[in-house]
């Protein structure tokens, strides 16, 4: 889940400490399923860089001043400019860079990663967002984080998590999601023995979808040569995915399961994936997460989640591309309706053949293209999807002795009433990454990272003193709930605490209202209404959680892979057919209108 971005210099709601000069890495090649021919006039591919194993996160950056790039009627300096360095943007950028595209990533803050970043305080290294890392195994085709790192010669040491999450639910229902699938099924069926066949049926369908996805080479679904090639190679797998594309997890679950409490448990499973219940969660998204946790397992990177983005950024530079920090993009420049560049807050301009926005679609079309008429397809997107709520987040350091020796790393707490699952402050998600990696905290200490849904409307308009008082009050009530349910004496064991609100997330993540991402207005037709990477504006692409397939680490990495492939085709680094492109993109656009 995406949480407040706190940079290495200041944190929470303190003023951001600006630098007088932009910082950047002039960072180089490999590939992630991109094996198509490149233009003949491109230089020969460089060798895959020596694999670098990353063991820890450092907040150091390389500082330099970079001047804006102006067009003089000649070729644009860059093949692609990526706005933002979240995981989706970095995967897209690195995948283009390994094909020897010239890429510039522009990041508003001091470090890469966005909600997958980190910050350091008083000897602690805190993950900004989720510590549950999917797509980080050493096998299959859905280990997209591992593949993305490998593509730029990077490998991170990881620690396997034996339990994905420990659920603490109403009616004293306690369920551990064990790494081994058989152990998980055994535990769940022991709680619901009368639903054993239903449990096997629902999760069996999840495996059908996961195995189909995992058998395919993952590229852009908007590129017809690839798409038709995959269909002819794997027709049954493609038809399976097409069958489930418009379906939701809750509807599938109800085909197999009748017990209302078990269905509520599946709602909680999906809520972690999508911040909505199972009836609103696309079956494909649910299946990716509910199976990858057993297939490849949850693996935590040594030194913290922030090392992923840092390693991708360094790998990008190794490929000869660039990433600039303190580069706040304020607008996208259009020339006769085509996206040709970006303008920064300090007035500098950069130009490229293509622009890739890692901002949300609301921020892209509502702010970066402010004043432009909203394209019809974006109007349709906003009819189907709304902004999900944001989060209240609490980063704490506590005395180690307050946690029992057998404490799991991740917990989901909903104590009293299933109806509170989606309510503000109703559910609590807790990560304790020091259970896996003690190096993140001083000796004798643990990190507790707590978050719960909250809307920005609950925090707007408050004077500073009232705002700070409310943060402390809400945080205290959340901590008291955990103290009562899990860890007696928790409040008195706290040695460090910082609280972030939706206002914090809006400021540091540059996300409208601090939103977690898109969620459907009603019951969606699976993923049918979710837009891909191309947009109605020539030369402009979107990447991240407001693109297919949506929210989550695997999903945004997949979005980055797809975006890079489509852009590569459009700038001549992959095969393409203009005739087939027009037909496929038209068909996909029409299908989205059915959602």
Swiss-Prot record:
Keyword terms: Acetylation, Carotenoid biosynthesis, Chloroplast, FAD, Flavoprotein, Isomerase, Membrane, NAD, NADP, Plastid, Transit peptide
Topology of this chain in the membrane: Peripheral membrane protein
Catalytic reaction equation(s): 7,7',9,9'-tetra-cis-lycopene = all-trans-lycopene
Pfam annotation, one family: Amino_oxidase
Record's subcellular location: Plastid, Chloroplast membrane
Main location: plastid
GO terms under cellular component: chloroplast membrane
Signal sequence annotation: none
Cofactor: NAD(+); NADP(+); FAD
Keyword Chloroplast: yes
Pathway: Carotenoid biosynthesis; lycopene biosynthesis
Residues recorded as bearing N-acetylvaline in the entry: 57
Transit peptide limits: 1-56
Gene3D superfamilies: FAD/NAD(P)-binding domain (3.50.50.60)
Example of a GO biological process term: carotenoid biosynthetic process
EC number(s) given by UniProt: 5.2.1.13
An MF annotation (GO) of this entry: carotenoid isomerase activity
Function: Carotene cis-trans-isomerase that converts 7,9,9'-tri-cis-neurosporene to 9'-cis-neurosporene and 7,9,9',7'-tetra-cis-lycopene (also known as prolycopene) into all-trans-lycopene. Isomerization requires redox-active components, suggesting that isomerization is achieved by a reversible redox reaction acting at specific double bonds. Isomerizes adjacent cis-double bonds at C7 and C9 pairwise into the trans-configuration, but is incapable of isomerizing single cis-double bonds at C9 and C9'. Carotenoid biosynthesis is partly required to form the prolamellar bodies of etioplasts.
NCBIfam families referenced in this protein's UniProt entry, alphabetically: carot_isom (TIGR02730)
Entry's family note: Belongs to the carotenoid/retinoid oxidoreductase family. CrtISO subfamily.
Protein name: Prolycopene isomerase, chloroplastic
Taxonomic placement: Eukaryota, Viridiplantae, Streptophyta, Embryophyta, Tracheophyta
């Amino acid at each position: 889940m995406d949480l407040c971005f706190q940079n290495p210099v200041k944190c929470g709601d303190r003023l951001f400490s600006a630098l007088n000069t932009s910082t950047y890495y002039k960072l180089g090649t490999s590939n992630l399923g991109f094996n198509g021919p490149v233009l003949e006039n491109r230089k020969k591919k460089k060798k895959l860089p020596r694999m670098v194993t990353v063991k820890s996160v450092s907040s150091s950056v390389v500082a330099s001043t970079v001047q804006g790039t102006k067009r003089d009627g000649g070729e644009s300096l860059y093949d692609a400019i990526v706005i933002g360095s979240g995981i989706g943007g970095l995967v897209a950028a690195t995948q283009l860079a390994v094909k020897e595209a010239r890429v510039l990533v522009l990041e508003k803050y001091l470090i890469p990663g966005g909600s997958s970043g980190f910050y350091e305080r008083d000897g602690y290294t805190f993950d900004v967002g989720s510590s549950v890392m999917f797509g980080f195994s050493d096998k299959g085709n859905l280990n997209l984080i591992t593949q993305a790192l490998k593509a730029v010669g990077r490998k991170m040491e990881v620690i396997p998590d034996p339990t994905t999450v420990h659920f603490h639910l109403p009616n004293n229902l306690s369920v551990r999601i064990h790494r081994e699938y058989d152990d998980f099924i055994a535990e769940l069926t022991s709680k619901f023995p009368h639903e054993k066949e239903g449990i096997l049926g629902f999760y069996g369908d999840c495996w059908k979808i996961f195995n189909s996805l995992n058998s395919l080479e993952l590229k852009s679904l908007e590129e017809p040569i690839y798409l038709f090639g995959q269909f002819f190679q794997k027709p049954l797998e493609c038809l399976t995915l097409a069958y489930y594309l418009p379906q939701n997890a809750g509807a599938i679950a109800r085909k197999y399961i009748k017990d209302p409490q078990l269905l509520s448990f599946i709602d909680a499973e999906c809520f972690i994936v999508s911040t909505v219940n199972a009836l609103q969660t696309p079956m494909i998204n649910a299946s990716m997460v509910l199976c990858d946790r057993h297939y490849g397992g949850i693996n935590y990177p040594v030194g913290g989640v922030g090392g992923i983005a840092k390693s991708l950024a360094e790998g990008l530079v190794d490929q000869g591309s660039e990433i600039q920090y303190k580069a706040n993009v304020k607008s996208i420049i259009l020339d006769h309706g085509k996206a040709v560049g970006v303008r920064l807050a300090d007035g500098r301009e950069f130009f490229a053949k293509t622009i890739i926005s890692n901002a949300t679609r609301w921020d892209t079309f509502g702010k970066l293209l402010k004043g432009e008429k909203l394209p019809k397809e974006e109007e349709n997107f906003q009819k189907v999807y709304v902004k999900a709520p944001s989060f209240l987040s609490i980063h704490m350091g506590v005395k180690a002795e307050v946690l029992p020796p057998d404490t799991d790393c991740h917990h989901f707490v909903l104590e009293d009433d299933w109806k509170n699952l989606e309510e503000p402050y109703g559910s609590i998600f807790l990560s304790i990454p020091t259970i896996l990696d003690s190096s993140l905290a001083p000796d004798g200490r643990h990190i507790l990272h707590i978050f719960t849904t909250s809307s920005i409307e609950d925090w707007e308009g408050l004077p500073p003193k009232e705002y700070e008082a409310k943060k402390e009050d809400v945080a205290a009530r959340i901590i008291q709930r955990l103290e009562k349910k899990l860890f007696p004496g928790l409040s008195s064991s706290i040695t460090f605490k910082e609280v972030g609100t939706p206002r914090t997330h809006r400021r540091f993540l540059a996300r409208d209202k601090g939103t977690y991402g898109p969620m459907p207005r009603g019951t969606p037709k699976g993923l049918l209404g979710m837009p891909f990477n191309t947009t109605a504006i020539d030369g402009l692409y979107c990447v991240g959680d407001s693109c297919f397939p949506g929210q989550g680490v695997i999903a945004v990495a997949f979005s980055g892979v797809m975006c890079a492939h489509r852009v590569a085709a459009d700038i001549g680094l992959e095969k393409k057919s203009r005739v087939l492109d027009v037909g496929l993109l038209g068909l996909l656009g029409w299908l989205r209108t059915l959602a």
